Amino acid sequence: MTDTEHRLEVVEAKEAVRDCLARYLDLCDVPGPLQSPDQLGVLFTDDATWEGLGPEYAGKFGIARGRDEIVALVSRYLPPADHFLRNVHLLGSEQIRLDGNRASGQWIMQQLSLYATGTAEILCARLTIDFDLGRTGGRTAARMSRFCTRRMFAAPLPAEAMFQRI
């Protein structure tokens, strides 16, 4: 493999990781494009884990093992469940490392939420995620094999601000 081919492989692998995580967060936004829980499931390996870490998230989320448990856990917070009225995710501070057909990454996620209860908050969490890399249709594809989230910051927001129109 030439240096150029290797560099292209690295770029494609990192882009596949970004695409997978961005799709997951897009599906978790409310309102969002989620039509079926299966859309979430295909983003994870069969034996994936999804885990809440730290004092705020370990008890709230615990650990889900396997694709079906992960989809069930995440679906509890998405329509048609009456949890969020609005919810949006933003990512930053990206770090992606590649090791053969595996990748790992860390991000800071900002989440703005308006709950069905009428309360609103902003929070930041550290996401630490492992991915399996493969080829699908001639392209590099990533699926999450381990997803960990740890809350770093949270503060209430005035709910009326979430209803403002631009």
Task: Tell me the role of every PLM-derived stretch.
Residues T2-E5, H83-I166:
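A beta-strand edge to alpha-helix "cap/lid" segment located at domain peripheries
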Residues L25-P33, T49-P55, S113, T136:
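Short regulatory "switch" loops immediately downstream of catalytic or recognition motifs
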